[in-house]
A protein has these predicted regions:
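Extended helical coiled-coil dimerization/tether regions that scaffold
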Residues: 92, 97, 121, 126-265
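Loop/turn-to-beta-strand initiation segments
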Residues: 266-267, 299-304
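Conserved D-loop-proximal element of ABC-family nucleotide-binding domains
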Residues: 280-281
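H-loop/switch region of ABC-family ATPase nucleotide-binding domains
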Residues: 306-308
């Protein structure tokens, strides 16, 4: 994880400079820029991917900034009207450097090694619409196009888990009757249609099954689905390499490995808005654990969370990691009984920011430098305000 995002004067963002890690948490009130940050990150990761697969050339976006970079690319997440005259955006990874400034957009290709392609999923806060609608929605009038993408993946996930899926809380099980196109939620002694279930279940189910579904696809290492055009191009490039008598076997192998990396997903980038939506704190904790388990499925997976809730914390998973790594066999066993290693978070792989409306730089890290966990003092401002008003 070596991606960096610098943004100035864009929508609600005044000035940020963020280096992303394996787990990234953005906490703050409405309108502080949490979603804006992760939408930009999603946009640039997708742009990297489309350039690597040569679906589009760099010139396609750099020569027509307003129509293609702003309206087409940024418009996917409905952030195309966030630009100002003094907007500056920089995104940099091992593979590309993207810079927007003065209504120009530049793309610089770097010499980083391609190890595969990311499977990127943006999980919107509006996901409850999918559960309450039940029938597959073909249009999302008034909502970003990203909702339509998530809708399609949600239905693929339902087919994958139609024989049953256990939610991470409440002893609840999900079943999908594909013949009649009906989703069911089963408790210990009851069964209701998903459209009649609680808002918490309607919000949580799409997150759970889509995350599990895509995480399993990436972890399996299978080739990703390709269009006929992509497949033909890959076959043509493979034949060209194999038929070139001027290349040594070692060079051919290296070039073929490079081509192969374009046909496989090596990581799942899971971007989830408000995982705590309509959930009780204990259920929020179970949801976070599931997302972290999926994120730990492969080394290069990434998890980005936006949240309003101080309950959406990762400290227990960090502390469990630290105790497990330092402990003897007996300590490891006791820690694993409380928090199994599949949920653990390495503090070196975590970043967390609090965003506010005030100040030129309206963000700050809430990680303690000494402990590596999220500082309670930075997140307890609401409690202090309530107590001050009460007193």
């Amino acid at each position: 994880m070596n991606e960096r995002l610098v943004v100035k004067s864009f929508g609600p963002i005044r000035s940020i400079d963020i280096n992303f890690r394996k787990v990234n948490l953005f906490i703050g009130d409405q309108g502080t820029g949490k979603s804006c940050i992760v939408k930009l990150y999603s946009t640039f990761r997708w742009l990297e991917k489309t350039l690597l697969t040569e679906t589009y050339s760099s010139d396609y976006f750099t020569k027509f900034v307003d129509a293609r970079f702003k309206k087409q690319l940024c418009g996917y997440h409905r952030i195309d009207d966030f630009f100002r005259d003094d907007t500056y955006i920089l995104y940099e990874s091992a593979l590309y450097k993207f810079v927007y400034a003065g209504n120009t957009f530049n793309i610089e290709k770097k010499n980083g090694t391609i190890t595969g392609l990311p499977k990127i999923m943006y999980v919107p806060a509006e996901r409850i619409i999918l559960s309450s609608a039940e029938k597959k929605l073909k249009t999302f009038d008034g909502l970003p196009a990203s909702n339509l993408t998530f809708n399609q993946t949600f239905w693929e996930s339902k087919e994958r888990f139609k024989d049953g899926y256990s939610l991470p809380f409440g002893n609840l099980n999900y079943e999908y009757d594909s013949l009649n196109d009906i989703s069911w939620i089963e408790g210990c002694d009851y069964r209701v249609r998903l459209i009649n279930a609680s808002s918490g279940i309607q919000s949580a189910l799409p997150v759970c099954i889509v995350s599990d579904y895509l995480g399993n696809i990436v972890a399996s290492g299978n080739e990703r689905p390709m269009s006929v055009k992509e497949l033909q191009k890959l076959q043509k490039e493979t034949s060209k390499i194999m038929e070139n008598e001027n290349l040594s076997d070692s060079v051919k192998n290296a070039m073929l490995k490079h081509l192969s990396s374009r046909s496989r997903y090596n990581c799942f980038v899971n971007i989830v808005e408000e995982p705590e939506l309509s959930l009780f704190p204990e259920s929020q904790n179970s949801m976070i654990r599931l997302l972290c388990k999926v994120n730990n499925g492969t080394t290069d997976n990434m998890l980005l969370l936006t949240s309003h809730s101080p309950y959406t914390l990762l400290n227990n998973l960090v502390l469990a990691y630290k105790a497990y790594e330092k402990g003897d066999d007996n300590i490891k066993r006791m820690v694993a009984e409380i928090v199994p290693p599949e949920y653990h978070i390495d503090p070196e792989s975590l970043t967390a920011f609090s965003l506010t409306e005030a100040g030129m730089e309206n963000y700050q890290s809430v990680l303690s430098e000494s402990s590596g966990i999220i500082s309670k003092n930075d997140l307890d401002s609401v409690s202090e305000l309530i107590m001050r008003e009460f007193n």
